[in-house]
Curated annotation (Swiss-Prot):
Its EC number is 2.3.1.-. InterPro entries: Ac/AlaTfrase_AlgI/DltB (IPR024194), AlgI (IPR028362), MB_O-acyltransferase (IPR051085), MBOAT_fam (IPR004299). Its main location: membrane. It comes from Pseudomonas putida (strain ATCC 47054 / DSM 6125 / CFBP 8728 / NCIMB 11950 / KT2440). This is Probable alginate O-acetylase AlgI. The lineage of its organism: Bacteria, Pseudomonadati, Pseudomonadota, Gammaproteobacteria, Pseudomonadales. Together with AlgJ and AlgF, forms an inner membrane complex which probably interacts with the alginate polymerization-transport complex and adds acetyl groups at the O-2 and O-3 positions of mannuronate residues. Acetylation of alginate is important for the architecture of biofilms and increases the ability of alginate to act as a defense barrier. It is found in: Cell inner membrane. Pfam families: MBOAT. One of its GO terms (biological process) is alginic acid biosynthetic process.
Length: 485
């Protein structure tokens, strides 16, 4: 089940919210857990056993780590056992096929018989719920959060359906108080609805339209320079609007239930360095990698060379987290290399002024990286890079011109104008969120006033949301890109 589907919008969500607000406070976490398992089982019922098993395992390990004491040797042994089993589960389901295929390629080159392995199906969301479980037991070990004895709350944290499939990557220590006591207000619910609709519009109106352009350009066997750059730019925008759209919808759903999740994007394409980019892109993952991998490797505490090595390894493993493919490994290495270079050069990664040259160079590095991230294999990536940097024919090929529509071109232009407007607005506000406000305000004399700008903005969002639903009914199924990770 996906958020941008009729089943979710018109069946699952209304029934869940109705039951949620009709039930008492003490039963809401249990209802959330049951609903989240139903949501997950809509994909495959049989993987619920794995999901529940991982949850119970980390709940038990958390208790053992907590009982052993903060940062003690016994606690460390329990922690290593817990993390080891978690990574073994993730490694089997996510990397077994890749590992066997790579090994077989080597063996057959020497004339040896290949291994035979039944194809291992990747459970949806496993990368996210494994990482969240690992962060919990590490936080218990570090003393950042006590081990919970409330199995319902912990299981609901792991399973909570708004973020279950594609993040944000949540942490128990940030949400434990909200599970125990969260507020439900009309303002928060209204904010959640607006945020959900914004994400839905991003996904259906922009990302799904640009997906057709990107898919066609990457599929061309002999792309021109124009084809390759069009595909790269279309995918760059598609990925942002798709993934940030999902995050907006997840955050909005959380608000409807009284939760406030962390922000996952802060206008990343306005960045003037790769370091700044990773403070703005997929924030929940980048901070997870920093806190639980980079720091564990030693961070910047063990000399200059080790700092560069740790930056590189963190991003290399971050690339591998995205999938079992050499393309993701190279993408991670690409970003790790530039993070290390920027640290070595001592670049200003907190700019107070907008520098077009720094921005353009950073954006170019990001776009170049997205090409190999999107490519199915190294051959496709090489084909795209060869066309992009041959600087040959900037005209679109006949195949591309025949497929490209005016709506797709207009959507691409609108996407980048939107990115530029909100990115520059965010930069000149020093990345501070706008003060919370509501369309309806009570004046000093007790009269009711309306902020017509906000009223019209929300009316436009509602109109576009309805139009997006109509568009959704006319197009084929289009899952979120990060479902595959």
């Amino acid at each position: 089940m996906v958020f941008s589907s009729n089943v979710f919008l018109f069946l699952f969500l209304p029934i869940f919210l109705g039951l949620y607000y009709l039930s008492g406070q003490r039963y809401r976490n249990l209802l959330l857990l049951v609903a989240s398992y139903i949501f997950y089982a809509w994909w495959r019922v049989d993987f619920l056993a794995l999901f529940a098993g991982v949850t119970l395992w980390n709940y038990w390990i958390g208790l053992k780590v907590g009982a052993a004491g903060v940062r003690t040797k016994p606690a460390q042994r329990w922690l290593l056992l817990g993390v080891g089993v978690d990574l073994a589960i993730l490694g089997y389901f996510k990397y077994a096929n890749f590992g066997v295929d790579s090994l077989n390629a080597i063996m057959t080159s020497f004339g040896l018989e290949p291994f035979i392995l039944t194809h291992v199906l990747l459970p949806i969301g496993i990368s996210f719920y494994i990482f969240e479980s690992i962060s919990y037991i590490i936080d218990v070990y570090r003393g950042d959060t006590p081990a919970t004895r409330n199995l319902i709350d912990f299981a609901a944290f792991v399973a909570i359906f708004p973020h279950l499939i594609a993040g944000p990557v949540l942490r128990f220590k940030d949400l434990v108080d909200q599970f125990n006591n969260r507020t439900h207000t009309l303002d928060k619910f209204s904010e959640g609805c607006t945020r959900f609709m914004q994400g839905f519009i991003k996904k259906v109106f922009i990302a799904d339209t640009l997906a057709v352009v990107a898919d066609h350009c990457f599929a061309l066997q002999n792309p021109t320079t124009g084809d390759a750059w069009l595909g790269a730019l279309a995918y760059t925008a598609q990925l942002y609007f798709d993934f940030s759209g999902y995050s907006d919808m997840a955050i909005g759903l959380g608000l409807m239930m009284g939760f406030r999740f962390m922000e996952n994007f802060k206008q990343p394409y306005i960045s003037q360095s790769i370091t700044e980019f990773w403070r703005r892109w997929h924030i929940s993952l980048s901070t997870w990698l920093r806190d639980y991998l980079y720091i564990t490797l030693g961070g910047n505490r063990k000399g200059t060379f080790n700092t560069y090595r740790n930056l590189f390894l963190t991003m290399l493993l971050g690339g591998l987290w995205h999938g079992a493919n050499f393309t993701y490994i190279i993408w991670g290495a690409w970003h790790g290399m530039w993070l290390a270079i920027e640290r070595a050069l001592g670049l200003d990664t907190n700019p107070q002024r907008f520098n077009p040259v720094k921005w353009a160079f950073t954006f170019l590095l990001v776009v170049v990286g997205w090409v190999i991230f999107r490519a199915e294999n190294l051959h496709v990536a090489a084909r795209m890079y060869g066309a992009m940097f041959s600087f040959g024919d900037w005209q679109l090929s006949e195949l591309n011109r025949a497929q490209l529509t005016g709506l797709q071109v207009a959507t691409l232009v609108i996407a980048y104008l939107t990115l530029a407007f909100f990115g520059l607005r965010d930069f000149y506000r020093n990345a501070r969120p706008t003060p919370k406000a509501t369309p309806v305000q009570v004046n000093a004399d007790g009269s009711i006033g309306l902020d017509w700008t906000r009223v019209m903005t929300r009316a436009l969002i509602l109109l576009l949301f309805v139009a997006s639903i109509l568009k959704l009914s006319a197009q084929s199924y289009s899952p979120f890109l990060y479902f595959q990770f």
